[in-house]
From Swiss-Prot:
It comes from Mus musculus (Mouse). This is FERM and PDZ domain-containing protein 1. Interacts with GPSM1. Interacts with GPSM2. Signal peptide: none annotated. CDD domains: FERM_B-lobe, FERM_C_FRMPD1_FRMPD3_FRMPD4, LGNbd_FRMPD1. Disulfide bonds: none annotated.
């Protein structure tokens, strides 16, 4: 019963509550209804609804800047205020809708509209106006008035606002969508709008809706953009024709948010203020937000940021009607100083200094007015001045794109700047603010965007006057560029026309070279095509006058499909008359001829298009061919080069013009009349030909003519034999048939019709478009001897080389009995073409290498003598470096310096021209400017041609006996193609300039001092069947000064692609190894797939002396083995890296001084203890007594070189599991007495080619003894003695932190984002060391064993069966110690840079070998590890960049610079240690692998930075040295940016 009573009472209470709620609801409904009725029936003065009129009398000062009072009146009576200018004098005092009662004591009812307007114009100083205002009529939004709201209701739009909702219980955050069909748009005024979209809703619909909502008139300035959530600097424009559904479905859009921005910044903000005050206010708010978010921090100085903060504060004070004397304390307390100053300034400046600076600038801002002006500055003036200061920044008024510009004869990596003030410009030097205009928006006819690969796209900008600009960019950047150009075109040129139409569903149908006849401007698809710069060959510019004409620009502007292609063109190359050639040439319709190109071998830029697949042999030399313009028949009557009349006729007519440096015509070709004379002059050959060239008259005369030379050459516009004949002409064969048959008489009439030269381009293009173009021409024609080094070639050597090449050319003229028959060659070429597939290959971070099909062996049999080095197998990398600068030719040719990554830095062909390179600089001084990417913004695109010959059919040696020779030049690197083994071993062959143009290498090896040659034989031309190289003792090869001057200044680094040294060494006669020889067993050698096994027989009595400059090998006293101090020879360089000069020989060992007298002499007294030293070494190594010690190497060399290889001294990035064993011979031969030699290959760039081709054999211990060197406690004596030879050396590194720690003073030399080192003291910087971070998961815990530290280089430390990985028990032992040793090893100052180079090589070896599987972390903790890794990596990167800024300061001595370099190296090692600590899981392993590659790029780029610092210390602070150092610092900044970008721009997965 009690339970029943309780339930009844609860029921009663519930009913009572329900009744109470119902009563409340009923009362509220009744009261609202009564209120509505009262409002409808009540008097008009009811305060619930009636408008309360209020009279206001205000006095307005005339705005001096705008020359008005900041408001507009209606054109009809009654007089009302229609609009108020934002920031003007009337802003905040008058409002739209105010009815004017009185103006300057004149009643409005007595005024007409015209009279009121006159009063506004005539009043000089102040205007008194009385208005009546309804209090409830003030709009709730400063953007949206009542009348606008009514218009919106009467004119609905397609896109509807939607309320923000929660999806699946999660907050919206910064997501792109509120719900599946609702787009979230962020406005710069702080508002957020959500738009519901349908399947057919476009971006333009949303823009128009926002336009109506915000009452914006000038909507052409606005666009929607996607901002990456974790990288606010990356904004991607959306094309107005894109469907919103497609935008939100993209994978890359998931971590982005949509912004409504002023994406097209006006030239002058004053124009926008007068045109649309609302848009101007929006731009101002957007700019303030960008400054606070530090979008321009890379460019903005500290002083500018503080001045902008002062302007922002003053603008807020005036806009909010605050008292003018407001204190900064009030602002800081009520408003917050963080709303005006960026976080970086707040962190790095004291509050007292900030207040002082802002007060100073606020007083200074009052001076913006004229002195006689009495009124205060207005808010509009403050806003305008704010935007004008920002307009000085390139990143504000424009957007920077790093792209590959495809020019006529090469591709150039450039930094583009696109903006209202700049048009389409190229940044020549960002530090000096040197910009060259490429095109104006008014000259653009259309823009095309085509996809080249998943991550790379091509943008073609068609110009009205100069054909087309073709650019390769990342896909997102390419789309931004196209949208930006189209937007500015619509803004400044034609609002009704769009030059870029979006077709999101259209897929590109072709690549850079396509199957359907899409041709490259200067490429070839035949087997004779030269992959080295054809136009740089001595004869190409004179001989390859093709049967093609420069078409008028009217035809060139047509798109590829605008004009029909004749059947002759589609059918292929014409085989008969010139008439068919002319028809096909005139109807050829490709408009991309001057945009695509073959790879440039002169720039050496991996950031540029290093290679594009060639399309047609005739187009291979179109850069040289197109420079020939054939004129009327009278031209063929004769051309006497010594006749002023004829010279003037050529100059004025522009019929025949050839770009070159030569000024004198060939004396052998003078006084030759008729077509035979022309053929002889244009196609003659001989050792002295390069001295006779025609002046570049057409080029110097008109820039438009230069672009006229970019006409495309159709494959069907030439004779079928022209390719092979042109190639034969280029290589020194007989003149082509068209040169011998007087073809110009037959073609003169038809040629005149297509020779019309276009008019000059407008001044917009004339201003700066030729900077890069002239640079290209200079680069194209620069003699390689000036490019490769500052010193001139030895005349005797040049003469011998010329003779050698001449003989090789003569032998290559007739490769077979019928080799000269055009018909046979044509058939062979057709057969080869049928087996060859054209394709282009673009490599980015997301692409892989592509191998090309094999070529026909039959064609190679006939053409191998013609194009030998043309088919070098170029390999490239998987992790391209963003921007690396080449230090090549810093002394001899500063005019050709350019920001380039050291990609395929093949040596230019050796020419016989001795013309100085100064003429190039006289022709275009601007080319001396270095080109720099704008601070830390970088492109990761490089275009690569990958040539692989899996069947080893490339580069066959067609001559027997001595056909394979090692080319030699005192100024050029070894080609890497001296033998089939060398050609197949090298992943990065260096093409020698001394090779015969026909492809046959020189039959003689030139040695400069002796003025003699040394034939070198090859008994095993087949790479698949390697055997020992045998050369008689008299055949000792000496490679002299292999780019020694470049070796001291440049390190040929292409990411992880290695430069392989030429395989040379002590070679002995005989068919097999003798008792005094060390044979590398090829059966036990496991190399990578692209390597070739070989055996090396070493002579027991003779060694090869390799010269690398006069100071490389000097006589020095030997040091005792037990010298524990580790002193080295002062006169002997500390490192002969394989990376310094490309192809440099790593060993310098001699037992007998050569004839040159540059070798070290041996001492009889030093040879007495050889046997004892051998036994001691074997004891230290714990080797068997019968272990072989080759007689060619002293004990020190074995310890420094061979032991290094045993313990992992060198790294092989190409082969990870290489096994190299040495046969043991019972007898120990006599040792060479040479005592102290630098270790042989301390570079991480060695490849397996070193393993069998280096002078030092690779010793591989038995498996059970392979790791004994990493147990120093078990062999203390061996550890002690070996530590001396392999010790790390770097000038003055120490871990002592400065005593005084504090915030560094900013001198404002750089942007404020980089001029502060940060708040962390130096002691905190050491926290990044791998040994002092116990909280992070250590991959290499401290060793528990002996504290004896051996500075092992973490490279190839593995047994004969097990490859090294981070899981190996060696890794925790030597990696931590190696890094710690690198960071703490002190050195003396004189050898600082040399030893720093060694330490860098040690670090590179560690990086190459250490990155393996690594430790793991649970996937559920990946987010935590990611966040920690990102913060520490960014901190370490910031420290490194901050220390690098101290290196490039001008006000310091060389000693101070060396100290600053030491600090940077410490930070670099610390950064590497941070990366080593990364642990991974299945979710983040890919990102960490990319970090490994990017870290290697950072180290390589830092290597060049150190070289530039060394050059600056040696030469002093000259303008050129400082520019070079600054440019290298920029390259390093870009590399570090790429390292951290993966973490900044991605989430924790």
């Amino acid at each position: 019963m009690e339970e029943l009573d309780g339930s009844l009472s609860q029921t009663r209470k519930a009913h009572r509550i329900e009744q109470m709620v119902a009563r409340w609801l009923r009362r509220s409904r009744d009261s609202s209804a009564r209120a509505k009725v009262a409002a409808a029936d009540g008097p008009p003065g009811n305060p619930a609804q009636a408008l309360t009129p209020v009279r206001h009398t205000v006095t307005l000062d005339k705005d001096v800047l705008l020359q008005n009072y900041g408001f507009h009146i209606s054109e009809t009576l009654p007089l009302t205020v229609v609009a108020v200018t934002a920031g003007g004098s009337a802003h905040g005092k008058l409002f739209p809708g105010d009815q004017i009662l009185q103006m300057n004591n004149e009643l409005a009812e007595d005024l007409s509209c015209e009279r009121a307007a006159d009063i506004l114009r005539e009043t000089e100083d102040a205007l008194s106006i009385t208005v009546v205002r309804c209090t409830s009529g003030v709009p709730k939004s400063s953007f949206l008035t009542e009348e606008k709201r009514a218009r919106l209701k009467s004119n609905p739009v397609k896109v509807h606002f939607a309320e923000e909702v929660l999806v699946s219980g999660h907050s919206q955050g910064n997501s792109l969508l509120c719900m599946p069909n609702v787009l979230k748009v962020y406005l710069e005024n702080g508002q957020t709008k959500a738009f519901k979209f349908e399947a057919n809703t476009t971006v333009k619909d949303i823009i128009l809706t926002v336009k109506e909502k915000l009452s914006i008139r000038s909507i052409e300035y606005f666009a929607l953009a996607l901002e990456e959530q974790y990288s606010i600097s990356r904004l991607h424009l959306l094309h107005e024709e894109e469907l919103v559904q497609q935008v939100v479905e993209r994978e890359e859009s998931q971590d982005s948010r949509c912004l409504f921005r002023v994406s097209f910044v006006p030239k002058d903000p004053l124009d926008l203020l007068k045109e649309d005050p609302v848009a101007f206010e929006y731009l101002y708010l957007q700019s303030c937000s960008d400054v606070l978010q530090e979008r321009f921090a890379v460019e903005m100085k500290c002083n500018s940021a503080l001045r902008l903060a002062a302007l922002h504060i003053q603008e807020r004070i005036y806009a909010c009607a605050q008292p003018q004397k407001i204190s900064l304390k009030y602002i800081e307390k009520d408003w917050g100083i963080e709303n005006f100053i960026s976080p970086t300034l707040l962190r790095n400046m004291k509050g007292k200094d900030i207040k002082k600076a802002i007060s100073f600038h606020m007083k200074r801002n009052q001076n913006l007015l004229e002195p006689r002006q009495k009124q205060l500055i207005s808010a509009a003036q403050l806003r305008l001045n704010y935007l004008q200061i920002l307009g000085e920044l390139k990143t504000y008024g424009g957007k920077v794109f790093n792209a590959t510009l495809m020019l006529q004869d090469r591709e150039s990596y450039i930094a583009l700047l696109v903006g209202a003030k700049y048009g389409i410009s190229q940044i020549i030097n960002s530090k000096l603010n040197i910009i060259s205009t490429l095109a104006e928006f008014a000259n653009i006819s259309r823009v095309e965007l085509t996809e080249e690969s998943e991550k790379v796209s091509m943008v073609k900008v068609y110009l009205q006057d100069v054909k087309v600009l073709t650019l390769l960019l990342e896909s997102s950047s390419a789309k931004d560029l196209a949208c930006l150009i189209a937007g500015y075109y619509r803004l400044f040129v034609d609002p009704a026309n769009s030059v870029f139409h979006w077709s999101g569903n259209r897929r590109p149908t072709h690549r850079v070279s396509a199957e359907e006849g899409y041709e490259s401007r200067a490429c070839s698809d035949s087997e004779e095509s030269s992959e080295v710069d054809c136009v740089l060959e001595p004869l190409s510019d004179r001989c390859l006058v093709k049967l093609s004409l420069c078409r008028p620009f009217a035809r060139e502007e047509q798109p590829p499909g605008d004009s029909p292609t004749p059947e002759a063109t589609r059918r292929g190359p014409s085989t008969c008359g010139a008439s068919s050639m002319t028809d096909s040439a005139e109807s050829e319709a490709s408009d991309s001829a001057n945009t695509e190109s073959r790879g440039c071998r002169t720039s050496g830029s991996s950031e540029s298009m290093d290679a594009l697949e060639e399309d047609d042999l005739d187009a291979c030399s179109s850069s040289g061919t197109s420079f020939f313009h054939f004129g009327p028949p009278g031209f063929s009557k004769g051309l006497e080069t010594n006749s002023q009349e004829e010279n003037s006729r050529v100059e004025t007519s522009g019929f025949l013009c050839l770009l070159d440096l030569g000024q004198n015509a060939n004396p052998q070709c003078q006084k030759i009349d008729g077509p035979q004379g022309l053929a002889s002059e244009a196609c003659s050959w001989g050792p002295e030909l390069s001295m006779g060239r025609l002046d570049p008259r057409l080029y110097e005369g008109s820039r438009t003519d230069y672009y006229n030379l970019c006409s495309s050459i159709s494959p069907g516009s030439h004779l079928s034999d022209s390719g092979s004949e042109s190639t034969a002409s280029r290589q020194g064969a007989a003149p082509p048939q068209w040169c011998q048959q007087g073809w110009m008489e037959a073609q003169s009439g038809s040629m005149l019709e297509s020779l019309g030269l276009p008019a000059l381009p407008p001044l917009a293009f004339e201003g700066g478009s030729s900077d890069e173009e002239y640079y290209d021409a200079a680069d194209k024609l620069t003699p390689p001897d000036t490019l490769s080094g500052p010193r001139a070639a030895d005349p005797s050597a040049m003469r011998l080389q010329s003779q050698s090449r001449t003989r090789g050319s003569e032998e290559s003229l007739h490769p077979g009995p019928e080799g000269g028959e055009p018909s046979r060659q044509g058939g062979v070429k057709k057969y080869a073409k049928s087996l060859r597939k054209r394709r282009s290959f673009l490599q980015t971070d997301h692409t892989s290498q592509v191998s090309f099909p094999l070529e026909a062996s039959a064609s190679q049999e006939n053409t191998d003598d013609v194009c030998y080095y043309d088919r070098e197998p170029y390999l490239t990398l998987t992790a391209p470096s963003p921007t690396v600068s080449s230090l090549q030719d810093m002394q001899g040719e500063p005019g050709l310096l350019e920001t380039k990554a050291l990609g395929l830095l093949a040596s230019l062909r050796e020419t016989k021209s001795t013309n100085p390179a100064s003429r190039i600089m006289e022709m275009e001084p601007e080319t001396m400017e270095t080109k720099s990417v704008i601070d830390s913004r970088v492109s990761s695109i490089s275009a690569i041609r990958l040539r692989i010959d899996p069947s080893n059919t490339e580069n066959p040696v067609t001559t027997d006996g001595s056909s394979a020779s090692i080319p030699h030049s005192p100024h050029h690197s070894n080609p890497g193609s001296s033998s089939p083994q060398a050609a197949q071993v090298r992943p990065f062959p260096i093409v020698s300039p001394d090779q015969d143009p026909g492809g046959t290498t020189p039959k003689e090896l030139t040695a400069e001092p002796e003025d003699s040659t040394f034939p070198l034989s090859s008994d095993h031309p087949n790479p698949d069947n390697p055997g020992p190289h045998h050369v008689s003792q008299g055949d000792t090869s000496e490679l002299g000064e292999v780019r020694s001057e470049i070796g001291s200044e440049s390190f040929l680094i292409n990411h992880v692609q290695e430069v392989i040294p030429q395989i040379t060494g002590p070679l002995c006669p005989g068919d097999g190894p003798t008792s005094g020889e060390c044979e590398v067993n090829s059966e036990e050698t496991a190399l990578a797939a692209d390597e070739v096994q070989g055996q090396l027989s070493l002579d027991s009595d003779r060694e090869v002396m390799h010269r690398n400059g006069p100071s490389l090998f000097q006589k020095g006293s030997g040091k005792d083995l037990g010298d524990s101090k580790g002193d080295r020879l002062d006169n002997v360089p500390q490192a002969l890296d394989v990376r310094a000069p490309a192809g440099e020989i790593n060993s310098s060992l001699c037992s007998e001084p050569p004839a040159t007298g540059t070798g070290q002499t041996s001492s009889d007294s030093e040879g007495e203890n050889r046997e004892a030293q051998e036994q001691e070494l074997l004891t230290e190594l714990d080797l068997a007594p019968d272990f072989l010690l080759p007689s060619a190497f002293p004990p020190e060399t074995i310890k420094a070189e061979q032991l290094d290889r045993v313990i992992g001294e060198d790294s092989v990035p190409v082969s990870t599991s290489q096994q190299v064993c040495v046969h043991t011979v019972p007898s120990l031969p006599k040792l060479s007495p040479c005592q102290e030699e630098p270790r042989s290959a301390d570079s991480g760039h060695g490849s397996p080619a070193e393993s069998k081709g280096d002078d030092s054999p690779i010793i591989c211990l038995p498996p059970e003894r392979s790791f004994l060197c990493f147990a120093p406690e078990s062999h203390p004596e061996g550890s002690t003695s070996l530590s001396r030879v392999t010790s790390f050396s770097f000038a003055g590194i120490n871990e002592v932190a400065p005593a005084e720690i504090g915030i560094e003073h900013c001198r404002c030399q750089f942007s404020y984002a980089t001029c502060f080192r940060g708040l962390q003291p130096e002691t905190e910087e050491e926290d990044g060391d791998p040994q002092t971070h116990p909280a992070a998961p250590l991959t290499s815990p401290p060793s528990a064993g002996s504290q004896v530290t051996l500075p092992w280089r973490a490279a190839r430390a593995y047994s004969c069966t097990t490859p090294l990985s981070r899981k190996s028990h060696i890794w925790p032992e030597f990696c931590s110690r190696a890094l710690r040793q690198l960071k703490t090893t002190p050195t003396n100052a004189p050898e600082g840079f040399v030893q720093l180079t060694e330490s860098l090589l040690e670090l590179q070896d560690i990086l190459e070998a250490s990155w393996g599987v690594g430790n793991k972390h649970p996937p559920d903790k990946c987010t935590l590890h990611f966040s920690e890794s990102r913060s520490r990596l960014c901190m370490g990167s910031q420290k490194l960049l901050a220390s690098c800024q101290h290196v490039i300061r001008m006000d310091q001595s060389p000693e101070e610079m060396q100290g600053a370099v030491r600090v940077t190296f410490q930070h670099l090692v610390q950064l590497a240690g941070l990366c080593f600590q990364f642990t991974d899981c299945s979710r983040c392993s890919t990102r960490h692998r990319e970090v490994a590659g990017n870290l290697r790029d950072v180290v390589y780029t830092y290597h060049q930075f150190v070289e530039a610092a060394k050059l600056t210390c040696e030469r002093g602070y000259h303008d050129f040295s400082v520019k070079l150092l600054a440019r290298q610092c920029t390259a390093l900044t870009a590399a570090v940016f790429c390292l951290t970008q993966k973490f900044r721009a991605s989430t924790a997965l």
